[in-house]
Amino acid sequence: MKSVFLSPNTLTMSRIILTVIFIFVMLADGFIFKFLGAAIFFLASFTDWYDGYIAKKHKMVSDFGKLMDPIADKFLMLSAFLVFVKMGIVPVLAFLVIFGREVFITFMRLYAKNKGQILSAEKFGKYKTVSQVFCVGSILIYTVLRSADTTNSWSDVTISRWQEYIDFCIMVAVLMTLGSGISYYFNNKNVFRLQ
């Protein structure tokens, strides 16, 4: 008998709960909160991989999981970017591009499903996900290191270089997100044709 604690659906729901906790913890001031926030995000990201692994290995794939897993993934990633907007790290426009792409692609998939069609994921989309995770991870590392510097020992050059690196990560994530969304639309636009 499989343990309920290893249920993919349980892990998916735990990811949603962890995301809510992540939001409040990251918005609090202090090194300990930034460190815990980063740890929670990486733990939530791990559950994303682990629930898929368990579902396939133990043949526990369910309709609930198919619906909620991508929703939990998007909730985690969009929440992270929104938190960074609140912290003044990510521009609002960058967040809107990422948010808009995810909402539009989700709408396309639901619309297609309603018509009895299944729109499969593209490799471009996987690259988009990698760029977003790398971007969020980099920002989390930066915020943890900055919050640990209670003596303000970072030089202006160090801060400037970190900011340039973070800006580059954001730019790549936005371009990959926008590009994957455009690619997905043109490769699946037939779903909008009237029959």
Go through each PLM region and give its residues:
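Alpha-helical transmembrane bundles and membrane-interface segments of multipass inner-membrane proteins
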Residues: 1-195
